[in-house]
């Protein structure tokens, strides 16, 4: 397994089963140009934009960064926590992704052999 810190809370986790991108804020600013990466982020690579899974921990803009989400390959499976409201799920679908898989607190999921 290899973990790469992209910036802020964004991680890229590579396993034998595939790649997971966590909280993709890959470039630019968020919160109306008031927050920026430090150190400054670099332009995302093509490889970075093609994860197998994307895990969004919650709906704050520095974790669910719309400009970054728009650049990601739509074949990625989106994973979100089950909160009991459909806001994150609806917004993921509005960006052109399939309905996300909701994760239940304390339960394991199988993402393949890795």
Predicted regions and their residues:
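Conserved G/P- and acidic residue-centered "switch" motifs that form tight phosphate/ATP-binding loops
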Residues: 58
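Metal-dependent catalytic neighborhoods of phosphoester/phosphodiester hydrolases
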Residues: 65-75, 90-93
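Metallo-beta-lactamase
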Residues: 80-114
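Structured loop/turn residues at beta-strand edges in well-structured enzyme cores
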Residues: 49, 73-74, 95, 114
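Pre-active-site segment of Zn-dependent metallo-hydrolases
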Residues: 16-55, 66-71
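A short helix->loop->beta-strand "cap" motif at the edges of active sites that frequently abuts
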Residues: 18, 74-77, 97-98
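Bacterial Sec-exported substrate-binding components of ABC uptake systems
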Residues: 1-9
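Beta-strand-turn-beta hairpins that frame and shape the catalytic cleft
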Residues: 1-2, 14-20, 108-114
């Amino acid at each position: 397994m290899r973990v790469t810190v992209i910036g802020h809370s964004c991680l890229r986790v590579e396993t034998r089963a595939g790649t997971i991108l966590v909280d993709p804020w890959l470039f630019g600013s968020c919160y109306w140009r008031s927050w920026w990466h430090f150190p400054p982020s670099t332009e995302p690579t093509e490889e970075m934009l093609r994860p197998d899974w994307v895990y969004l921990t919650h709906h704050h803009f520095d974790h669910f960064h719309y400009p970054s989400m728009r650049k990601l390959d739509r074949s990625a499976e989106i994973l979100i926590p089950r909160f009991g409201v459909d806001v994150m799920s609806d917004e993921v679908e509005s960006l052109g992704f399939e309905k996300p898989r909701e994760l239940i607190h304390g339960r394991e999921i199988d993402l393949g052999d890795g």
